[in-house]
Amino acid sequence: MTFSVLLLAFLLRILSTSHLAQAQSVAPPAKLSVHWEELTAADFREGIHRSQGTCLLPFGILEKHGPHLPLGTDLLDVRYAALHAAEQEYAIVFPEYYFGQIAEARHEPGTVAYSREMQLALLQETTDEMARNGCKKVIIVNGHGGNESLLPYFAQTQLDKPHDYVVYVFDRRSPESGGPAKKTTIDMHAGESETSKMMIARPDTVHIDRAATESGADQHRQNLPEDVYTGIWWYARFPNHYSGDGSAATQELGKFQMDWWIDAVAKAIRAVKADDVSLKLQNEFYEKSKHPLDTQP
């Protein structure tokens, strides 16, 4: 009798252990923060594995945004979009980065404008260090219009020498159409769209009552053809570093545009994770560039 009881207890223990193991094996993975700076070293390792080595570098700036938005608007907006996108499609998001191109706003208080040498060197060091830590797919998510030439140029210069990682640039911040009707036609900086998005990302920093205290109108102080570029073009048109009318902003427009942005970044993350061609082509290119005379059509 005693033997039967012991045998039954033994079998029940094995069965319960088996069920526990099965439950643990099908349990969803533990939630990991998408914030680089919030992860422990061990969790960072797991995050790299879970993200398939895909990391985001949200790129902002410190500059005046009209009379009503904070200096860090671009950084606050792009990080809001990137962090929410990474929650949808897991990726590790690098901490605050604002070391970009903003020479055109050096006359305004609070602007931090680094030299072109520093911008490129620091960005290269940053992506190199991200890759050394396992981020073999670095997506730079741009939040600042003044970086629109800098970032593609930086990505192109990655062909200068071999790298074991790929730099991708994502530079769409608003949909071309759809959503609530806009009230303004000029809307390039701190205007209706950007103010609306900040009403979603950081409404506590928006001073909508100040939006009409300065002019965001185009001053048309140059008379050059559209295809003739000069660095002073922005200051010539918008000397107040304000383009548009932020007082027209609404939360409805902000939610539509921010939701679109988050979804677009999430789609970009998925596409980059699935990309198994770019690094192979980079390596092929590096090898061929050593012996250009051997390259055949």
Task: Please give the residue ranges for each predicted region.
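Extended, histidine- and acidic-residue-enriched regions that form the cofactor-binding/catalytic faces
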Residues: 24-117, 121-137, 145-297
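Bacterial N-terminal signal peptides
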Residues: 3-18
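Short intrinsically disordered, low-complexity coil segments enriched in acidic
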Residues: 1-3, 63
